[in-house]
């Protein structure tokens, strides 16, 4: 049975890789603006501050796998991205094995129900790193179930160090640990601290040294950086508001009206999760400690996520664990065979009804990026380049500018801050200032004045 278990895991990874390779090449907005640019800067001498752009303040390490994979042929690179996402499916199946009194088929069906979710499908074969962080957090849950709190904390802390959006499910891991083995709390905390230092400590120090805050520009009411107003910088476009919003959210997700992304997203599995909770409540006496731990992780993580962020990409750990909860609820009342059949039916039906965020894709080429030769030939040493934050274009720059040219990305959210004066002081010493933008008006305009768009040239 163990041999077949490894075979199924390999097939899950291979299946995700194959699906990713069959899609067109990922060209999502965030990738073109900062998923490639900031890792490139990381490997080529560091950052040119100030950047008046939110992506600058995120740890670039989660994007390094994508950056390195772009050296491959685009089809191979995207297949590799799909394979990395498949790790989350494998870990989900392993969690199901721990909590379900069933065979290989039931746990595999749980993994299939997990991968048809809107969040996972939105990130499959893309440059987004949230699915990789989900694999780490789900791995932490698996380690909690195996009563290995030190390693579980290590993965949780590392995920938070890479991206603070992992925090809700890292805290959910802690609650799950209290269900399984509360005496392991100290070891979990030690592991989490070490994990955060390893992946996020250097980045926090870099932000502190440059912007006087280890989490700049977030939580500035606490850290008081002089470069940003004293606010906590929350995005109110997403999530829920008021009791009615909380109660309606599963139904809104099923209808596709929930505010979880800029693109339409629909996932009926959230309504099914509510039904699963009813089944679990009715059969609570037959629940195992491991089952309660998975339930606590899923529900507490989802509540924290929805209260703080509400962006579906950040909920992938809970989205995938929810599949295990649904199968767990069925298994309380049905045989192993019936549970497997019902789970597969749910995976097919919900997979058809689910709408994932269809980000921009283009036809595959011979390399991941192809920039028109000579597009930046007029830029010379000592110049400065400003990139409009509302038009994704930093991917055009790597390797196409003189090494001593400074590049600054400008976003309107940061132009009313003291960072604008810092930028203007730096630009005063530039031989010439160039702007990379789309059609006017540009977000650079409020910083340096209106641009003479009539004399601009097109870059491909």
What residue spans do the PLM features occupy?
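Hydrophobic, aromatic-rich transmembrane alpha-helices
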Residues: 2, 85-97, 251-289
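Short hydrophobic/aromatic helix or loop-helix immediately within or flanking a transmembrane segment
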Residues: 37-38, 42, 53-75, 247-253
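Transmembrane-helix signature of polytopic, membrane-embedded enzymes
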Residues: 90-118, 135, 151, 289-292
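Short acidic/glycine- and proline-prone juxtamembrane loop motifs at membrane-interface regions
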Residues: 119-132
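Signature aromatic-anchored transmembrane alpha helix within multi-pass, membrane-resident enzymes
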Residues: 150-154, 174, 189-197, 324-361
């Amino acid at each position: 049975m163990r041999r077949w278990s490894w075979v199924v895991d390999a097939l899950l990874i291979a299946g995700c890789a194959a699906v990713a390779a069959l899609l067109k090449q990922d060209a999502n907005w965030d990738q073109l603006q900062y998923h490639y640019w900031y890792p490139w800067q990381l490997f080529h001498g560091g950052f040119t501050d100030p950047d008046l752009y939110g992506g600058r303040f995120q740890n670039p390490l989660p994007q390094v796998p994508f950056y390195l994979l772009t050296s491959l042929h685009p089809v191979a690179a995207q297949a590799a991205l799909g394979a990395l996402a498949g790790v989350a499916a494998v870990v989900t199946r392993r969690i199901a094995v721990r909590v379900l009194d069933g065979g290989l088929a039931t746990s595999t069906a749980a993994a299939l129900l997990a991968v048809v979710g809107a969040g996972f499908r939105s990130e499959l074969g893309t440059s987004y790193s949230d699915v990789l962080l989900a694999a780490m957090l789900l791995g932490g849950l698996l380690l909690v179930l195996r009563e290995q709190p030190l390693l579980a904390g290590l993965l949780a802390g590392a995920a938070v160090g890479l991206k603070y959006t992992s925090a809700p499910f890292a805290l959910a891991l802690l609650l799950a640990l209290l269900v399984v083995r509360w005496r392991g709390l100290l070891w979990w905390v030690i592991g989490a601290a070490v994990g955060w230092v390893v992946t996020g400590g250097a980045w926090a120090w870099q932000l502190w040294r440059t912007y006087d805050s280890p989490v700049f520009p977030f939580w500035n009411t606490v850290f008081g950086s002089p470069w940003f107003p004293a606010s906590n910088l929350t995005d109110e476009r997403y999530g829920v508001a008021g009791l009615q919003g909380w109660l309606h959210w599963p139904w809104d997700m099923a209808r596709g009206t929930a505010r979880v992304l800029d693109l339409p997203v629909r996932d009926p599995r959230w309504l099914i999760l509510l039904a699963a909770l009813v089944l679990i409540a009715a059969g609570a006496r037959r629940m195992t400690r491991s089952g309660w731990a998975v339930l606590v992780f899923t529900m507490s993580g989802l509540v924290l996520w929805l209260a703080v962020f509400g962006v579906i990409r950040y909920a992938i750990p809970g989205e995938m664990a929810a599949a295990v909860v649904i199968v767990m609820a069925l298994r309380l009342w049905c045989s192993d065979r019936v549970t497997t059949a019902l789970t597969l039916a749910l995976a097919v039906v919900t997979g058809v009804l689910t709408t994932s965020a269809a980000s921009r894709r283009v036809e595959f080429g011979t390399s991941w990026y192809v920039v028109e030769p000579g597009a930046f030939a007029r830029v010379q040493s000592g110049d400065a380049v400003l990139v409009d934050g509302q038009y994704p274009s930093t991917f055009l720059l790597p390797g196409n500018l003189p090494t001593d040219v400074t590049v600054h990305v400008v976003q309107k959210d940061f132009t009313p801050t003291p960072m604008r004066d810092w930028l203007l002081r730096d630009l005063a010493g530039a031989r010439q200032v160039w702007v990379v933008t789309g059609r006017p008006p540009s977000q650079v305009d409020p910083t340096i004045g209106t641009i003479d768009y009539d004399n601009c040239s097109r870059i491909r």
